């Protein structure tokens, strides 16, 4: 925890500066003109120069050209949709699959309320939140890895056979 220096309002020098309107920059460096005129343009122009330089030096295609007459056997979404895709793929009832898919963001909306149950920040002193996080992470990884496998091996990750 940092130490905050509080100004002594009984100091006559500080009172004179506050009377002149100089109190807000008394502790630190002003943003105008140092940051706004010198540092920000360098950062912005440097970022633009890096992007243009990479585009000129390494002009690569964005993906492969599409072939409208050849559809792949297994269409996979982007990697961050793998767990939800796996839920839709393995649940036989479509309505139940959609309800489970909707429950993912609804469950994430409950996280702030679960976090505020305990005032401690140490994860070892918040066992409920830590357990929910670890189980959720394990399930998301399990579903995400399973989405990349064929449907027969997706639930067991190919580790054992279910007959």
Swiss-Prot record:
GO molecular function annotation: electron transporter, transferring electrons within cytochrome b6/f complex of photosystem II activity; electron transporter, transferring electrons within the cyclic electron transport pathway of photosynthesis activity; oxidoreductase activity
Transmembrane segments: 36-56, 95-115, 131-151
Keyword entries, A-Z: Chloroplast, Electron transport, Membrane, Photosynthesis, Plastid, Thylakoid, Transmembrane, Transmembrane helix, Transport
Superkingdom assignment: Eukaryota
Subcellular location: Plastid, Chloroplast thylakoid membrane
Bilayer disposition of the protein: Multi-pass membrane protein
One GO biological process term: photosynthetic electron transport chain
SUPFAM superfamilies in UniProt: a domain/subunit of cytochrome bc1 complex (Ubiquinol-cytochrome c reductase)
Gene Ontology CC entries for this record: chloroplast thylakoid membrane
Subunit structure as annotated in this protein's UniProt entry: The 4 large subunits of the cytochrome b6-f complex are cytochrome b6, subunit IV (17 kDa polypeptide, petD), cytochrome f and the Rieske protein, while the 4 small subunits are petG, petL, petM and petN. The complex functions as a dimer.
Similarity-based family: Belongs to the cytochrome b family. PetD subfamily.
PANTHER family in the cross-refs: CYTOCHROME B (PTHR19271:SF40)
The protein's role, per its UniProt record: Component of the cytochrome b6-f complex, which mediates electron transfer between photosystem II (PSII) and photosystem I (PSI), cyclic electron flow around PSI, and state transitions.
Protein name: Cytochrome b6-f complex subunit 4
Organism: Phalaenopsis aphrodite subsp. formosana (Moth orchid)
Taxonomic path: Eukaryota, Viridiplantae, Streptophyta, Embryophyta, Tracheophyta
Gene for this chain: petD
């Amino acid at each position: 925890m940092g130490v905050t220096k509080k100004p002594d309002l009984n100091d006559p020098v500080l009172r004179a500066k506050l009377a002149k309107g100089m109190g807000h920059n008394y502790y630190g460096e002003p943003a105008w003109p140092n940051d706004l005129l010198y540092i920000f343009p360098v950062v912005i122009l440097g970022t633009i120069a890096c992007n243009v330089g990479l585009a000129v030096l390494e002009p690569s295609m964005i993906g492969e050209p599409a072939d409208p007459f050849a559809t792949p056997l297994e269409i996979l979404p982007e990697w961050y949709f793998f767990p939800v895709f796996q839920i839709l793929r393995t649940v036989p009832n479509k309505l139940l699959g959609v309800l489970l898919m909707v429950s993912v963001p609804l469950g994430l909306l409950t996280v702030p309320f679960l976090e505020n149950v305990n005032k401690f920040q140490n994860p070892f002193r918040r066992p409920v939140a830590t357990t929910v996080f670890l189980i959720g992470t394990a399930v998301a990884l399990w579903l995400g890895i399973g989405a990349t496998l064929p449907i027969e091996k997706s639930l067991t990750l190919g580790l054992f056979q279910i007959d």
